[in-house]
Amino acid sequence: MKQLRLILACLALTFPLLTKAGERASFRYGMEWGVNSAIHVGSHSSYISGEGYLVDSRSLDFRSHINGEVMGLIGLEYKRLGLYVRSGYMGLQKEECVVPVLLRSSFALSRSGVEKHGSIYIEGGCGLQKSKPVSAVTGTGYVYRLRLSEKLALDMNGGLRISYSHPDVYDKYAEQKVPKESLGLSNSLNIGLALTIALVF
């Protein structure tokens, strides 16, 4: 929760510095869902096998597994700038899911705002898992906003997703999950794409 408090504090402190006297930022909230795929995965693991041998494994793979994600978001928009906190449930790769806490910053490509030519974004934060080290999650991409009504918009997001995670490791000889007490390390760098849609109020 320390990471979440830090992100919320940054969000609260930044916008008063950006807005001028008499001008107000717009508060936004919504729900986002979609898919992502870790296409390029580099992993490194080490563990003690059931026979007592030290196994050190490194791999570099191209994959096509599709992961889902469901997120809630809150944020502020001021002219061409946007700051949002996003959290929910996200798959990083096959059989590995996290609770992400992400801070997204966006910049509209038109002076008229995000609805004219969309916006570009960059985001970063952490992915939380029970009894595992914290993962790092970051990304960048493009958002196209379609106004559905005066108070409701549909955002279509697409971009690059990069994460550094700590997946479960399976003993390639015993074909079973390596227990925590036998695991030395498990690191995975995942590079892929994310496509989502969001209803924003």
For each predicted feature, which ranges?
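Cleavable N-terminal export/targeting peptides
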Residues: 1-26
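Residue-level detector of intrinsically disordered/flexible regions characterized by low predicted structural confidence
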Residues: 4-7, 88, 106, 118, ...
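Short glycine/proline- and aromatic-enriched beta-strand/turn motifs that initiate or cap beta-hairpins
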Residues: 20-83, 87-89, 131, 190-200
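Non-catalytic effector/regulatory segments
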Residues: 27-36, 71, 118-122, 149, ...
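Predominantly the C-terminal beta-signal and adjacent terminal strand-loop region
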Residues: 40-44, 58-60, 89, 138, ...
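A subset of solvent-exposed loop/turn segments in beta-rich extracellular surface proteins, enriched
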Residues: 43-58, 98-125, 164-178
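Gram-negative (and chloroplast) outer-membrane scaffold detector with strong preference
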Residues: 71-141, 146-154
